[in-house]
Amino acid sequence: MKTLGRVNGIISNIVIAKVDGAVAQNEICYVYCGETRMMAEVIKVMGDEAYVQVYDSTRGLKIGDKVEFEGHMLEATLAPGLLSRNYDGLQNDLEKMEGLFINRGSITDPIDFDATWEFKPLAKVGDKVSAGAWLGEVKEQWVMHKIMVPFIMQGNYTVKSIVAAGTYKVTDTIAVVTDSDNNEYNLTMVQKWPVKQAIRCYTEKPRPSRVMETGVRAIDTFNPLAEGGTGFIPGPFGAGKTVLQHAISKQADADVIIIVACGERANEVVEIFAEFPELVDPRTGHKLMERTIIICNTSNMPVAAREASVYTGMTIGEYYRSMGLKVLVMADSTSRWAQALREMSNRLEELPGQDAFPMDLSAVISNFYSRAGLVKLNNGATGSVTFLGTVSPAGGNLKEPVTESTKKAARCFYALSQSRADSKRYPAIDPLDSYSKYLEYPEVREYLDEHIEKNWVDAVYEGKTIVQRGKEANDQINILGDDGVPVEYHERFWKSELLDSVILQQDAFDSIDANCPIERQKMMYNMVLGICRNSYDLADFEECSKFFKELIYLFRQMNYSEWKSEQFDGFKLKIENLVNEKLEK
C-alpha cells in the first residue's frame, strides 16, 4: 500500500507534507492540485514531515491537498528505442507532448512499448549470468543494443530458457533465469535504474589510456581529452561554449552522444533539433541524430528538473557503456544545475557556503564527475563514458565556486577567454590557461607515441613554450614600441602568431576546416614547429611581419583545402619555397 500525506506548507516549489508512514530520502511522490498530478522528490525528512521538491509550478496548490508516495527513487527507463529521442529532464518524450507549451503535470512514455525489435540471443540455456551480463542483442539504428540482465539483480543466476531469434516487443519475456533457491525471474528488454546511483556492473575501472579524437586542433593537439575522461569548458557569455560543444558532438569519435541542455536558452536546443537530423556522420555515413539522445531542460522549464536532467543523461550513458560502447555525455551548462542546488539549499534554510552555494557543492560535483570513466566489463569487453561539461561563471570570473569545484574534479580544463573571443580567435580556448592532466599519464604518453609519433608530448610542450614566449615578447613590444626592441622579439612574437593562427584557430562553419583528422593535425603541427625552430634573415620588424603574414595566409588556405589534394600540395610547396628564401645562411 502506498504511503499518503497531506500538504502542510508551501515555499515556492518546495512542499512540506505531513506523512502517515515511512518515506525515504530521494523517494518520488505525486502532489495533487485538483485533477493535475505533479511529480516531486523527497529532499529532506524530519519526523512525520517530508520536504518535497516539485518538478512543476506549485501555483494553485493549497494546504490539505493529497500527496502520494511511490516507494522508489527517480528512475530512468532503459531499453531499445532511446536513440534519436528528445527528452525532458525526467525522461518524458517531448515529441509526444501536445501543444505549443508543456502543460503542468505532463508525463509521456520514454519509449514506444508497442514497437517490435529483431532479437538475437547471445546467451544459452545453462549459462551462469549476473547483473549486466549480455543475454542477446537487437539492432537499434546502427548500434548493436545489448539486452542485459537487470542491474538491480544481485548475485548469480542460471539461464533456464531464452527465446529463439525473432521479432519481439520490449515488454515480452525474452529469458527466464533462476537463482540458487530455484526462484524464477522473467526478464524483458526493459529495465529501470535510479538515476542518482552509479551503475557498477564491471570488474575494474582502469585509468584512461586512449585519446578521444574530436577533430578540434586546440583540443586534440594541445590538450587531448582521454576516452573515459572528464573535461569542462568555462567561459563568459558569448565566448563560444555552445558552438564548441556542438562541434565536438558532431565530430567526436564516439558510438553514442548524449547532449544534456541543462538550463540553457531554448533557441540553442532548437538549433540541435534542426541541424542534427540533417547532418551525416563522416565515420559511419549515417545521420548524426541516429546516435544522439537529447535531454532538454531549457531555462524556462522547472528549475528543480535541471538537477534530474544531468543525472538522467549520465545514467543513460552508463547503460550504453555496459554494452561495450564509447559514450560521450555533454552537459551545457553545469552552472545552471549548481544554481538549482543553491535554490533548493536556500529554501531548506541550510548553512550557505561561498556565494550562497551549498557547503557540499564540491562533493556533489566530484561525485557526479567520478561516474564517467573507462570500465572493463564482466565479459572482458571495455566501454567508456567521457564527460564534458560547460560552466558559465557570472561575469567570466573563473574563481567562483562552481568553476573551482569543477576544476578539482575534471582532468581537462578548456578556459575560454573573452579577449580571444573579442578578437575572433575561435575556438577561444586560451592556450596558456588551459591544460590536460592526461598528458602526464604514462599510459596516454605511450598511446600518443604509438599512434601519432615518438616524443609527441615533448613536441606539444614545445608548442606551448613558443606561445608563452610570444606573449612575453608582445608585452615588451607594447611597452617599448616596434623600434625599441630587437628583431628577434618580433620574430618570437610572429612565430607564436603563426602557431596560434594555423593550429589553435579553426573555422567551425567550414566543411573542411571544421573537422581535422589526427593525421592531418600531426603533419600541420610538425610543419609549423619546423618553421618555428629555424632562424630567419630578416632586416627589420616590417620585413618580419610581412614574411610571417604571408606564411599565415598560405597556411590558412591549406586549412581550407581538401587533405592531400592538388591544391593542398600546391600551398605546401609555396610555403617551403618561401621559408627556404628567408632561412639564415
Residue positions per predicted region:
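C-terminal amphipathic alpha-helical interaction region
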Residues: 539-585
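P-loop NTPase nucleotide-binding/switch module
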Residues: 99-133, 137-142, 146-152, 169-229, ...
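Short histidine-centered loop motifs in beta-beta connectors
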Residues: 54, 59, 118-128, 159-167
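P-loop NTPase catalytic core
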Residues: 221-222, 228-551, 564
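Short, compositionally biased
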Residues: 43-49, 80-91, 142-166, 184-199
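Conserved "cap/hinge" positions at secondary-structure junctions
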Residues: 19, 33, 70-71, 90, ...
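N-terminal accessory targeting/assembly segments
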Residues: 1-103
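Short beta-strands and strand-coil junctions in structured, solvent-facing domains, enriched
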Residues: 15-16, 38-39, 50, 60-61, ...
